[in-house]
Structure formats: C-alpha cells, structure tokens
Amino acid sequence: MERVRIFDTTLRDGEQSPGVSLNAMEKLQIARQLQKLGVDVIEAGFPITSPGDKEAVSLIAREVKGVVVAALARASALDIETAWDAIKDAESPRIHTFIATSDIHLKYKLKMDRETVVERAVAAVKLAKKFTADVEFSAEDASRSDLDFLCRVVEAAVKAGATTINIPDTVGYAEPEEFGEFICKILEKVPVMDRAVLSVHCHDDLGLAVANSLAAIKNGARQVECTINGIGERAGNCSLEEIVMALYTRKDVLPFYTGIKTEEIYRTSKLVSNLTGMPVQPNKAIVGKNAFSHESGIHQDGVLKERTTYEIMNPRLVGIPESRLVLGKHSGRHALKERLLELGYELTEEQLNEAFVKFKALADKKKEVTDQDLEAMMEEEIRKVPETYTLDYFHISTGSTIIPTATVGLIKEGEKLEDAATGDGPVDAIYKAINKITGLTPVLEQYSINAVTSGEDALGEVVVKLKNGLGKIVTGRGVSTDILEASAKAYLNGINKLLFDYQAKGEKQ
C-alpha cells in the first residue's frame, strides 16, 4: 500500500472561517494536538497578513517538533522572505507559495498575462528554494484553469525546485470523476512530476471536497490538504477525519494508508470546535454526536445483536470513549484520574488536584457526572488564558414588573471589585456591570446557549463572541448548571482574552 500524506491547514484556511479568530497560544494548543494526531504537515499560517499571524507561526515553528511546519506566501519576494523569517526555527520548515492560473483570476484579480504568471511562479519557487529544500507550489483555482497552461506552470515550478505541487479546487467547482481525470492528465502531461509529490486542496462548496480528494488519490495524488471538522472559507474544506477514515475503512477499494493516529481524532475535533467557537453539527460524519447513535428500533435491535449490522467502524477507533464508570460525589481521585485518562486527558499531579476540586464542586450539584460533564470541565481549563479578572459572585434582581439589575463582584490581583448595572435582561445587566468594573466595552457579536448534558441538573454552555474597537474578535465560553453563571463566565473569559491580547501586543483598548 502507498502512503498518503496529510497536510493540515486548520490554522490557516480553517481560521479563515467567518467569525473565527485564534490567538497565538490557542494556535499553539491546536498545533501540538495536530502533531499528536500524526499529521505530516501543519500549515501554521500566512505570516504576511498580520504581525499576530507571523508571531503565531514563529511560536509553532519553535515549539512543535516531529512535523513539517509550513507557512503560506504569495509569489512575491516580501511574502516569501516574511514566511521564511517566521518558520526558520522549525525542525522541518516548508514554504508554500502560490499564484492563480485560471483565466478569470488572471484577468480580474492579478491583471497579468500568462507569461508573467509563469515567470512569477518560477521566481517564487527559486527564491523559496534559497531558504529551504522543502518548497510547495500551488496553482490557485487550478480546477478552472486551462489544462495545457496549468501543466506548463506546473512543469516550470518543478524544474525550478518545487518538491510538492498542489492542485486546488479553490471554489469547490469540481466533480469527482472529472477531478480524478484532471489529476491523471497532469501526471501524464508533466514528465517531471516524478520529482515532486502531487497534492490536492479541495473546497466543499458543492459538498464534494472529500469525494474529489478521494478521486484525486485514486488517480495519483499523494498528499491531501484538509482541516479538522472541515472548517474553512465559505462552505469549508476537505474534512481530515472523513478522508482519513474513508481510507482506513475502505482499504478494499482504497489501498492507501496515512500516519494518522485515529484514536486522537475525536479529541482533536473537540479542541478545534471549542477554541474556534464553531460547534460540530450533530449529524457530522465521524465526530458528530449522532454519528454512532441509533434511534430506529430495527437499528437498535441489530446493533445490540451484532454491532457491525449498522456500524462500519467502532467509535473507540476514532477516540470516542465507551463509558464504564459512573462518577458521583462519592467518587475519589483515582476514579477521576482513570476516567480522564480514558477520555484522553493526561494530567500532572498538580493538574489532577485542580481538576478534582472542580469535579467535587460539580458533583455536589449533579447526581451523576457524565463523560460530557468531564469533557466540558476539562475544556474550560484548556480555554483559559491568564486571568486578569476572576468571577467572585453575582446577584440578580429581576421579574416581570421590575428592571433587571445585576451586582457583580470580580477579583483582580487579589483586590475585590464590585459594581452594579441595569439591563434589558439579567444577562445584559451582568455584562454591563462587568463592563463598568473592567472599563472595557466590547461589542457582543454572538451569544448562544448549548446543553452539554441532559436532565434537570444539566450543564449548560454559553458561547459569546466579543469584538473590540480594533475589530479583533475573540470567543469566550462558560459552563455551569446555572445559565446566568455560565453567561458571566463566558463574557469574562472573552474579556480576559482581549486583555491578554492587549498585553501581548502592547495595545490599548
């Protein structure tokens, strides 16, 4: 069997999803988990776009080992030099440079003729090659490009030194049979392709990104660019978990393998969902909460008799745990440690002590603590940034005949701070009181409530998106059995993220 390389672009293309904004530490957390997952390449970002993105790419390049770290750059000297400056400390650095090749892009975006595009592509690859031996070249909008011209550009890029050639379906226009044939023709028409790996990057505008990627693999592509949960521009990208599990499950027709540790898929999906603020749809293949659920009586009967009647893969294969322990207020540290280990959380003694305190507080409010409760508890810790403010208490006065009023107490560097405010509702009143204490007035872009568990004592999760005066958007989360407390914690989590960014960059509100 031949190996297919997995190029993860969650931190670059995935972060281009509307409303997603990750800080450097959040990107580093995801990059570390991607390395643990076993991806071959992490595209850490597009350094020229902002100082913050360059800083995040540099951080990942320095800290994450055992994986290729790539930076994106347009076919321009400044982009390529900036990309190299960001990844120069990586153990295995890659410069990924690109230029569009379709006539529509040449005419309306680049305003270049074909000769100039070929020259720019060659110059970009040659410059990148001066910095690193690992250079990837992408022909943007390749699937809508004239095949003969595309092959000319590809051949020129390989001769200039590109070691990977990427063929993007940038706008998700391709159809699987057509795209597979397209890949086959490129390999036939470009005699020097034996010097480079052929890669594909498919978007999901028609819901065909995974199908197109599989068709490309069947026809000679040996690298697939994808994202966790399929996030990305517009309708998203090829989903890493779907392409990997398709290759794993259907070896009879897809005789290929990847280096992915499949048992890390679920945890990686949860981490990306939580840090980006993009919930996974319940019916999402592989990682959705309904992916291994059976409601039909006939299906339930079949699964109870023999799992393979209605399941083509075991949920444990992708890291979805099967609960064997029921935890409650009488459960001890050892039981908690064992269950967290089964869920994929390896804790130090100090971390276990902190987790146990939170667990006991949660167990006092609930009869049984489920896996979902534990995951929510741990993910709240994962999302933490250094806390300028912590929630001490809040009091609410509200009713059908009175104006909602909130009194909020926060702690900053050991000092207790308190203020009160009225609002259009109890949540609005809490947020206005927090604003008065902190002196910040971010715009609340989004507020949503999700049930983490079911039942009367269910945990509720509140997700907020806050935007500061500079246009920076952060995601805040809070979890509690009390939805007002969850709302306060989510807003404060967002406030602390904004303050963390200000301090890191020396900015002012």
Swiss-Prot record:
The lineage of its organism: Bacteria, Bacillati, Bacillota, Clostridia, Thermoanaerobacterales. InterPro entries: 2-IPM_HCS-like (IPR050073), 2-isopropylmalate_synth_dimer (IPR013709), AIPM/Hcit_synth_CS (IPR002034), Aldolase_TIM (IPR013785), LeuA/HCS_post-cat (IPR054691), LeuA_allosteric_dom_sf (IPR036230), LeuA_bact_synth (IPR005671), PYR_CT (IPR000891). Residues 390-509 are annotated as: Regulatory domain. Residues 4-266 form the Pyruvate carboxyltransferase domain. It catalyses: 3-methyl-2-oxobutanoate + acetyl-CoA + H2O = (2S)-2-isopropylmalate + CoA + H(+). Its cofactor is Mn(2+). PROSITE patterns: AIPM_HOMOCIT_SYNTH_1 (PS00815), AIPM_HOMOCIT_SYNTH_2 (PS00816), PYR_CT (PS50991). Catalyzes the condensation of the acetyl group of acetyl-CoA with 3-methyl-2-oxobutanoate (2-ketoisovalerate) to form 3-carboxy-3-hydroxy-4-methylpentanoate (2-isopropylmalate). It comes from the Bacteria. The gene is leuA. It comes from Carboxydothermus hydrogenoformans (strain ATCC BAA-161 / DSM 6008 / Z-2901). Homodimer. Pfam families: HCS_D2, HMGL-like, LeuA_dimer. This is 2-isopropylmalate synthase. The keyword Cytoplasm applies. NCBIfam families: leuA_bact, PRK00915.1-2, PRK00915.1-3, PRK00915.1-4, PRK00915.1-5. It is found in: Cytoplasm. One of its GO terms (biological process) is L-leucine biosynthetic process. Belongs to the alpha-IPM synthase/homocitrate synthase family. LeuA type 1 subfamily. CDD domains: DRE_TIM_IPMS.
